[in-house]
Amino acid sequence: MTRKKRRLYMLGLALLGLGTATALTLSAFEENIVFFYSPSDLVVQPPGDRSVRLGGLVEDGSVQKQADGLTITFRVTDTANTVPVTYKGIVPDLFREGQGVVAEGRMGGDGVFVAREVLARHDENYMPPEVHDALQRAGAVKTEVPGRSIYTPADSDDKVHATTTLKP
């Protein structure tokens, strides 16, 4: 084998190795990427069987604990749309109605989001940027009232869908 052919052979092997490494890296990233969805996003474009993060506010009056003591059902809203969620496990101490929440899981066939992890905001002034952006896209208006913040739909006089965030 001549020197020129050997160089081309080595270059070809190097490119093949680099291509394989790139393909494996992209495949690993694709499996581990979890997209963020608001309730409105889930209604418009359901993710199928893909694992996603659902963010919004826990709707007032929606939290229900089941008899087994571990399963909890609640609704997540961005004031425009609402998605029912079920979670089996211990919820964070800061989890409560009217608070921001991010749940990671999958949409079930019955239209209920099955969460495998639930994250609550960590203090009274923090809201995950994704949740804040989703509320703004949904047209929610934040109103400050002494001791609490209220998110309501911008185009509605109906306060039935109002979500109240109580500050401790």
Curated annotation (Swiss-Prot):
Keywords of the record: Cell inner membrane, Cell membrane, Cytochrome c-type biogenesis, Heme, Iron, Membrane, Metal-binding, Signal-anchor, Transmembrane, Transmembrane helix
GO biological process, one term: cytochrome complex assembly
Record flagged with keyword Cell inner membrane: yes
GO MF term (any one): metal ion binding
Xref: SUPFAM superfamilies: Heme chaperone CcmE
Any one Gene Ontology cellular component term annotated for this protein: plasma membrane
The protein's name in its UniProt record: Cytochrome c-type biogenesis protein CcmE
Source species of the chain: Rhodospirillum centenum (strain ATCC 51521 / SW)
Gene: ccmE
